UniProtKB/Swiss-Prot annotation:
GO cellular component, one term: plasma membrane
InterPro entries in the record: Ig-like_dom, Ig-like_dom_sf, Ig-like_fold, Ig_sub, Ig_sub2, Immunoglobulin_dom, Kinase-like_dom_sf, Prot_kinase_dom
Lineage: Eukaryota, Metazoa, Chordata, Craniata, Vertebrata
Cytoplasmic side: 533-960
Protein name per Swiss-Prot or TrEMBL: Mast/stem cell growth factor receptor Kit
Catalytic-site annotation from UniProt: 777
Domain (Ig-like C2-type): residue spans on this chain: 27-102, 111-194, 201-294, 303-396, 399-497
Changes after translation: Ubiquitinated. KIT is rapidly ubiquitinated after autophosphorylation induced by KITLG/SCF binding, leading to internalization and degradation.
Similarity comment: Belongs to the protein kinase superfamily. Tyr protein kinase family. CSF-1/PDGF receptor subfamily.
CDD domains noted in UniProt: IgI_4_SCFR, PTKc_Kit
Function: Tyrosine-protein kinase that acts as a cell-surface receptor for the cytokine KITLG/SCF and plays an essential role in the regulation of cell survival and proliferation, hematopoiesis, stem cell maintenance, gametogenesis, mast cell development, migration and function, and in melanogenesis. In response to KITLG/SCF binding, KIT can activate several signaling pathways. Promotes phosphorylation of PIK3R1, the regulatory subunit of phosphatidylinositol 3-kinase, and subsequent activation of the kinase AKT1.
Binding positions for Mg(2+) per the UniProt entry: 554, 782, 795
Length: 960
């Protein structure tokens, strides 16, 4: 059957060829012929005259076969015979055939590597051996979708024609078709797309400008990027320059060439522009770098502000200088009155590089004082040059009248000071008046202006003296001296009476002598009273809030600058006062009932802090500062929280939480006889210990030698059931509170309670540290205890009579708790978070010694100071767990930076709680809303100066 089919095909081919008329003038018509592999192929051209046969197939490496025979004959057809056959006569195609040779094993004739040009059509060579197929198409080798913008035309005789090839078409493809119901896939065809230049090359220079000195090396790199390596690039030739080149491919369609131009030693004549140029078929581009070679370096200063500056006292000021320098500056300093300034809390310097060889320097002056006016100089230099600029800073201060006195010869003198120099005006009005400013001014007799140093402009406050002759006034009256400067005014009044002068005949009469002696004695008495008053301790808020000034340096924030929110105001008529809880030299704390503090119909017991009638202005300001500090801190379960205040319509009242058990120190001493110590509990039934309540504390005066620091402890062991406390949740009613108070007060005290107290105080101090607040007087006497045995940190301040408290030692005009103070606080007047940690260690010793005084038997004298300096520390209290004594010792580290933070102490004690009594702290867990976000105060304070009234170290060298 195959032979018969072939014979029919050949006859059909011969018939078609023989139909072409002679001459070849009729346009040919292409036909296709399909034969099987191994069959005979015979094609005959019946054209008169000579003919030529041409054969072309899909193999690009195969040469076109030409034959001059009338007949084309192939005995054994193979897939290599697949192609187009053309019969030509006299150069014209008479007819053509495309012959398919079916091979059951091969459906596609594939060219595995194809190169195409971007934006052109490309043929993926995969012609078919058998045209009888379905769904002749294209796919990617990895099975991923074809590019979205790809369009192609399948051609059984040629393959797949892809239109408008793009760079993204690059990849591996396969032709596929359905043949005899089976999908056939070709071998891999790799398509490479040669990019077309659509833009100029991109040139990037390593620098656009270079400033050098003679003899220095100049090097600049030109980076050219393009789609392929056909790009041309070069530096425009310079005789003294050396150019090196490097190149690399950047992916499929990226190419980079680096041309580095180098001049080993530049000269002034090398100054100019250097151009790098690049070219591709799209066009040319270039970039230029400028070189400026100098014979010598330079420094140029530009003052961006007026060099004469007026600043009000208390305000911040900035001095800014811009400058250019080459080479780079070696020295950049700010000087004040020819002395170099170092960064401190009062001033700090910021340097910044703003560009090539361009710099700025800023001197920040913080809260300028009247004494900080003067000449500020900025000096900058390098190896070749130097320059400086000077600023004259004048600090304006308000005028102040120092004296208004009657001199001899009826001369009245008024002395005022301020900057700039104040102008003094005199006013007179008859009679005794409180103001005379509406009266006409009086011309002074003489005005003198005094400067600190007359040879240079004065930057400090200027003294102005003005005098008038009181004899010009014919009647008794009031004279006013007013000093005015920059709109600020200060005035003082002087009342005088015109009296008839009585001329005495004897100067030194007995009466005059007696009067002189009495006046002298009176002056001495007044001086003694003034001295006593100055030695009287001033009330001051112990809690101090700090702020960061520069890096790790901090200063105290003036509490008067803290805001006060009037939402804390509470009506005075809703307070009903009760008994006095505590009293001091300046004020007192009174128990009170507040009606409608949180609910309109509810009464609540509170503590109200107030001043005594004898308090002065400084004490009133201090109480207001304490109120502002409490409102700034916010609420926490372990501090005495602010509930309200009365600041309007009467004396200031500060309303805080009421703590029913008083201070922790006295609570511990009350519970000594019922304390349960684990070290003695198992022997409690066999031994009776001396009651600690009857054990007298040794006085400081009675002990001169070293004493063992372990206090004696006695116990009264209650039954185990007595230690079980009910756990309450939710809010307390009045009855609940009363019952809770009775239950807590009757319960015995054990180590778990002491751990709980230690933990709560550490939590409270961690909260204060997170608020940048330093306590400065942390001790058991300053910890209050309320129902549920919850401890609360407080500052008694005005409500403690420190004059009669032996814990406070007199130093200067201050009374300080020396035995609770860290060495740096004693010797350097430095109060930090770390000094609070030291005091906390002393408090732990108080706790586990059940209220004993620290350093028992040791008076605070030069020997005590010397022992502290040499590293003496107290022994462990008898009932202290070893872990708690380890915490005490770490708190007493001589290096403040080696002491733990309060957050770390909280974590250490939590381990003790979890190991011994997991339920201890469960009764007084605090809702998250009131805990605050207490974070570890990881930033250590380098130096915080005490703002206490005593600014000198407690121990001078002679005391040791």
């Amino acid at each position: 059957m195959e032979g018969a089919h072939l014979a029919w095909e050949l006859a059909h081919a011969v018939l078609l060829l023989s139909l072409i008329p002679a001459g070849g003038s009729v346009p040919h018509e292409e036909s296709s012929l399909v034969v099987n592999k191994g069959e005979e192929l015979r094609l005959k051209c019946n054209e008169e005259g000579p003919v030529t046969w041409n054969f072309q197939n899909s193999d690009p490496s195969a040469k076109t076969r030409i034959s001059n025979e009338k007949e084309w004959h192939t005995k054994n057809a193979t897939i290599r015979d697949i192609g187009r056959y053309e019969c030509k006569s006299k150069g014209s195609i008479v007819n053509s055939f495309y012959v398919f040779v079916k091979d059951p094993n091969v459906l596609f004739l594939v060219d595995s590597l194809i190169y195409g040009k971007e934006d052109s059509d490309i043929l993926l060579v995969c012609p078919l051996t058998d045209p009888d197929v379905l769904n002749f198409t294209l796919r990617k080798c990895d099975g991923k979708p074809l590019p979205k913008n790809m369009t192609f035309i399948p051609n059984p005789q040629k393959g797949i024609i892809i239109k408008n090839v793009q760079r993204s078409f690059k990849g591996c493809y396969q032709c596929l078709a359905k043949h005899n119901g089976v999908e056939k896939i070709s071998e891999h065809i790799f398509l490479n797309v040669r990019p077309v230049h659509k833009a100029l090359p991109v040139i990037t220079l390593s620098k656009s400008y270079e400033l050098l000195k003679e003899g220095e090396e100049f090097e600049v790199t030109c980076i050219i990027t393009d789609v392929d390596s056909s790009v041309k690039a070069s530096w425009i030739s310079y005789k003294s320059a050396i150019v090196t080149s490097k190149s690399r491919n950047l992916g499929d369609y990226g190419y980079e060439r680096k041309l580095t131009l180098n001049i080993r030693s530049v000269g002034v004549n090398d100054s100019g522009e250097f151009t790098c140029q690049a070219e591709n078929p799209f066009g040319k581009t270039n970039a230029t770098v400028t070189l400026k070679a100098l014979a010598k370096g330079f420094v140029r200063l530009f003052a961006t502000m007026n060099t004469t500056i007026d600043i009000n006292a208390g305000q911040n000021g900035n001095l800014t200088v811009e400058y250019e320098a080459y080479p780079k500056p070696k020295e950049e300093v700010w000087m004040y009155m020819n002395e170099t300034l170092q960064n401190s809390s009062d001033h700090y310097v910021k340097f910044k590089t703003v560009g090539n060889n361009s710099y700025t320097s800023e001197l920040h002056l913080t809260r300028l004082k009247g004494t900080e006016g003067g000449i500020y100089t900025f000096f900058v230099s390098n190896s070749d040059a130097s320059s400086s600029v000077t600023f004259n800073v004048y600090v304006k201060t308000k005028p102040e009248i120092l004296t208004l006195d009657m001199l001899g010869n009826d001369i009245l003198q008024c002395v005022a000071t301020g900057f700039p120099a104040p102008t003094i005006y005199w006013y007179f009005c008859p009679g005794t008046e409180q103001r005379c400013l509406d009266s006409p001014t009086i011309s002074p007799m003489d005005v003198k202006v005094s400067y600190t140093n007359s040879s240079v402009p004065s930057f400090e406050r200027i003294l102005v003296e003005s005098t008038v002759n009181a004899s010009m006034f014919k009647s008794t009256g009031t004279i006013c001296c007013e000093a005015s400067s920059n709109g600020d005014k200060s005035s003082v009044f002087f009342n005088f009476a015109i009296k008839e002068q009585i001329r005495t005949h004897t100067l030194f009469t007995p009466l005059l002598i007696a009067f002189g002696v009495a006046a002298g004695l009176m002056c001495i008495i007044v001086m003694i009273l003034v001295y006593i008053y100055l030695q009287k301790p001033k009330y001051e808020v112990q809690w101090k809030v700090v702020e960061e000034i520069n890096g790790n340096n901090y200063v105290y924030i003036d509490p008067t600058q803290l805001p006060y929110d009037h939402k804390w105001e509470f009506p005075r008529n809703r307070l009903s006062f009760g008994k006095t809880l505590g009293a001091g030299a300046f004020g007192k704390v009174v128990e009170a009932t507040a009606y409608g503090l949180f609910k309109s119909d509810a009464a609540m017991t509170v503590a109200v802090k107030m001043l005594k009638p004898s308090a002065h202005l400084t004490e009133r300001e201090a109480l207001m500062s304490e109120l502002k500090v409490l409102s700034y801190l916010g609420n926490h379960i372990n501090i005495v929280n602010l509930l309200g205040a009365c600041t309007i319509g009467g004396p200031t009242l500060v309303i805080t939480e009421y703590c029913c058990y008083g201070d922790l120190l006295n609570f511990l001493r009350r519970k000594r006889d019922s304390f349960i110590c684990p070290k003695h509990e198992e022997h409690a039934e066999a031994a009776v210990y001396e009651n600690l309540l009857h054990q007298a504390e040794p006085t400081a005066d009675a002990v001169n030698e070293y004493m063992d620091m372990k206090p004696g402890v006695s116990y009264a062991v209650p039954p185990k059931a007595d230690k079980k406390r009910p756990v309450k949740s939710g809010s307390y009613t009045d009855q609940d509170v009363t019952l809770s108070m009775l239950e807590d007060d009757e319960l015995a005290l054990d180590v778990e309670d002491l751990l709980s107290f230690s933990y709560q105080v550490a939590k409270g101090m961690s909260f204060l540290a997170s608020k940048n607040c330093i306590h400065r007087d942390l001790a058991a006497r300053n910890i209050l205890l309320t129902h549920g045995r919850i401890t609360k940190i407080c500052d008694f301040g005005l409500a403690r009579d420190i004059r009669n408290d032996s814990n406070y030692v007199v130093k200067g005009n201050a009374r300080l708790p020396v035995k609770w103070m860290a060495p740096e606080s004693i010797f350097n007047c430095v109060y930090t978070f770390e000094s609070d940690v030291w005091s906390y260690g002393i408090l732990l010793w108080e706790l586990f010694s059940l209220g004993s005084s620290p350093y028992p038997g040791m008076p605070v004298d030069s020997k005590f100071y010397k022992m502290i300096k040499e590293g003496y520390r107290m022994f462990s209290p008898e009932c202290s767990p070893p872990e708690m004594y380890d915490i005490m010792k770490s708190c007493w580290d001589a290096d403040p930076l080696q002491r733990p933070t309060f957050k770390q102490i909280v974590q250490l004690i939590e381990q003790q709680l979890s190991d011994n009594a997991p339920r201890v702290y469960a009764n007084f867990s605090t809702p998250p809303s009131t805990q605050g976000n207490a974070t570890d105060h990881s930033v250590r304070i380098n130096s915080v100066g005490s703002s206490a009234s005593s600014t000198q170290p407690l121990l001078v060298r002679e005391d040791v």
